[in-house]
């Protein structure tokens, strides 16, 4: 058996993958000529599209999985190593968030989650060879430094050498993404 989606997403970025389907539904609802179809699209089974939209705006669909070309961005070994390192660090930060979750306000927990989301968005955008990886990393660094400022140079309970190592990681991450 072959597993996967019938409409290839052509990205490594899980944030884009999650919103790509919603965006497609919004576009289909916008382009549908009949008002009934504009509403019905939200309640129909997965894959259903109005006939007029299907005709005017066809989507690439996999009809024969055996002949499907795999998504390949021809990344360097360095980029794979960098991405794996980012993934491991992001997981460690996620574990930290889960450990201290009940000690923080919801707003602070959400901001920490946004930092993690920006991190994943950045390194997976690099895997896709997209230029906006740097802007995501820049936004992440700005949010991190704002949160460090709010918490008197503490990162959610981490202090001392741990914070300096974290700051070093953020700076290196930004510089390497720019490179």
Task: Enumerate the predicted regions with their spans.
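Cytosolic/stromal cytosol-facing helical appendages immediately following the last transmembrane segment
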Residues: 1-83, 132, 168-179
């Amino acid at each position: 058996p072959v597993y996967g989606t019938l409409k290839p997403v052509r990205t490594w970025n899980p944030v884009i993958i999650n919103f790509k389907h919603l965006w497609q539904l919004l576009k289909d609802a916008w382009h549908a000529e009949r008002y009934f179809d504009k509403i019905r699209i939200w309640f129909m089974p997965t894959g259903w599209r109005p006939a007029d939209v299907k005709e005017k705006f066809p989507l690439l669909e996999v009809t024969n999985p055996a002949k499907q070309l795999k998504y390949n961005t021809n990344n360097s070994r360095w980029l794979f190593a960098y991405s794996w390192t980012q993934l491991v660090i992001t997981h460690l930060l996620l574990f930290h968030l889960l450990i201290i979750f009940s000690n923080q306000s919801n707003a602070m927990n959400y901001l920490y989650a946004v930092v993690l989301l920006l991190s994943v968005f950045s390194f997976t955008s690099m895997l896709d060879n997209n230029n906006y990886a740097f802007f995501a990393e820049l936004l992440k660094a700005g949010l991190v430094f704002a949160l460090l400022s709010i918490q008197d140079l503490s990162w959610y309970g981490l202090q001392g050498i741990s914070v300096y190592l974290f700051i070093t990681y953020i700076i290196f991450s930004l510089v390497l993404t720019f490179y």
